[in-house]
Regions:
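Short, acidic Ser/Thr/Gly-rich low-complexity loop/linker segments typical of extracellular
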Residues: 420, 428-454
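A glycine-anchored, Pro-Gly-centered beta-turn/N-cap motif
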Residues: 454-457, 478
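Short helix-loop-beta-strand segments that form the rim/entrance of peptidase-like active sites
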Residues: 180-224
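Structural recognition of the beta-strand scaffold that forms the well-ordered cores
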Residues: 79, 136-141, 150-153, 166-170, ...
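Metallocarboxypeptidase
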Residues: 226-416
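Extreme N-terminal flexible tails
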Residues: 33-108, 424
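A short, solvent-exposed beta-strand micro-motif common in secreted/extracellular proteins
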Residues: 447, 456-466
């Protein structure tokens, strides 16, 4: 039986046109949902505000607990979700004018083409069955409600432990951001189906592993499909937790999350408290990716760490350079511009407890958030109009990080008495850039290490206990292999 048909058989109704107020009208097609207990009449609004001072007022909105849906820094506008029965109001003398207001019936499900958690389960296992030499699927944890968290591993000789560098893609930290699942599933499908016919894809999968988590928050996704299409958090406790404010690094340290359980950016009772967060942390710690992209929506942005005010990563040439390069590969939905790159605090507002800051600080991953689609399309664009356009466009970004993983940099294996070791440390320092603090890389469990670098001369120091080896390398456009015996 069709999964979605069986789920909604008891209360389906025809698609509806949603009324417009103030300056615009919105049409949303979908399936009727059961009424949320928090939103009995189902009528929320998305308000577009024209801000007087974009950065300062974005900060005020975050600190005021408003649910920020998306923003356009270039036009100084921000979209706010205002729930039915909400007491929040907007003083135009403080925040600027409300230039658009759309009524959104949260009891209308997303377009039928988008995927439920059950459909994702079916799709990932079908892909593994169809391509057993390329694709493996594993459950890397369970949610509060007991759903499996699925990770897809795509590489040649998939059933062997290959010791290859890893690129990590993940989607749907936030439940209402349904287009992100499409991008993640498309990446897995594209790699598997093109391995036999595309020489570049073959090279990628022969030399690297691509790990993909298409749905970090399946409990929240289920709530989007059955109760509330604007639901953002997971479903633990009475109000849920924002999984992407729950990671331990800088948790509750820079006014980038909320301590109120009713807030859409509620960070949880403690750092790393959530099943989904713990599972993601364990997976990342095990696979130790070189790059990561977390797909979110919406606003057409490429974000990189750090996310608290005034903070930058030491490797700005690699991290920021990569973010800017990806942004140039992503045309806007309107076709007249590109995605905007930057840190969250520079473009939007401070964020604490996010996954990209934790990944970089803890495991030296080069991580990004890509905010898909424009403010015109929102969280749940027409599937037929925007799904293919979006996934095809975003391929350029995840393909960029795969290519970059296999280009300028250093990779090697550390051994002692001929055996690989996992407790060595590699420090790579530029011999050209004055004051370079370098990269400190922990060797993986299989004895390998990998660092993305810009071309130049580097000093490499490999240490384990009282044993140290120092080398000098010259990095050009290709990956340099340096195996070290201690």
């Amino acid at each position: 039986m069709n999964i979605r048909a069986s789920r909604f058989a008891m209360f389906c109704r025809p698609s509806v046109a949603i009324a417009a107020v103030l300056t615009s009208a919105v049409l949303m097609n979908g399936t009727a949902l059961a009424h949320s207990e928090q939103d009995q009449n189902g009528k929320s609004r998305i308000l577009t505000l024209k801000l007087h001072d974009f950065k300062a007022q974005m900060r005020e909105l975050v600190e005021g607990g408003y649910d920020i849906a998306g923003a356009n820094p270039a036009s100084s506008t921000v979209d706010i979700v205002q729930r039915a029965n909400s007491q929040q109001s907007f003083n135009k003398e403080i925040f600027g004018q409300v230039i658009e207001s759309k009524i959104v019936d949260t009891t209308i499900a997303p377009d039928v083409g988008y995927k439920t958690s059950a459909e994702v389960d079916e799709i990932v296992h079908r892909l593994a069955n169809n391509y057993p030499d390329l694709v493996t699927v594993e459950s890397f944890g369970r949610t509060h409600e007991g759903r499996d968290l699925w990770a897809i591993r795509v590489t040649s000789q998939a059933k062997q432990k290959a010791g290859k560098p890893v690129v990590f893609l993940n989607a749907l930290h936030h439940a209402r951001e349904v287009m992100t699942v499409e991008v993640a599933l498309d990446a897995a499908d594209y790699l598997a189906t093109n391995y036999g016919t595309n020489n570049e894809v073959r090279d990628w999968l022969d030399r690297a592993e691509i790990w993909i988590v298409p749905m970090v928050n399946p409990d929240g996704s289920n709530k989007v499909w059955t109760e509330d299409s604007m639901w953002r958090k997971n479903t633990s406790g009475s109000d849920g937790v924002d999984v992407n404010r729950n990671y331990p690094y800088r948790w509750n340290q820079c006014n980038g999350s909320s301590g109120s359980p009713s807030s859409d950016t509620y960070r949880g009772p403690s750092a790393g408290s959530e099943n989904e967060t713990q599972a993601m942390m364990a997976l990342v710690g095990r696979i130790r990716p070189v790059y990561s992209i977390s797909f979110h929506s919406y606003s057409e942005l490429v974000l990189y760490p750090y996310s608290c005010d005034g903070e930058h990563v030491p490797q700005r040439d690699v991290v920021e350079g990569g973010g800017k390069a990806m942004a140039q590969l992503l045309p806007s939905d309107g076709g007249s511009g590109k995605y905007a790159p930057g840190t969250s605090w520079e473009i939007l507002y401070a964020v604490d407890g996010g996954d990209i800051d934790w990944m970089y600080n803890t495991h030296n991953v080069i991580p990004y958030v890509i905010e898909l689609n424009s403010t015109s399309q929102g969280f749940q664009p027409s599937f037929s109009a925007w799904r293919n356009k979006t996934v095809q466009k975003v391929r350029a970004a995840w393909q960029y990080v795969i290519r970059r993983t296999l280009q300028s940099g250093i990779r090697g294996n550390v051994t002692v008495a001929g055996e690989s070791v996992d407790n060595a440390v590699v420090r790579v320092t530029s011999m050209i850039k004055e004051g370079d603090v370098g990269q400190m890389i922990k060797v993986k469990g299989d004895g390998t290490f990998h660092a993305v670098l810009v071309p130049g001369s580097y000093k490499v120091v490999v240490a384990r206990g009282d044993r140290t080896v120092e080398k000098t390398i010259l990095v050009g456009g290709d990956l340099v292999t340096l195996d070290v015996a201690l």
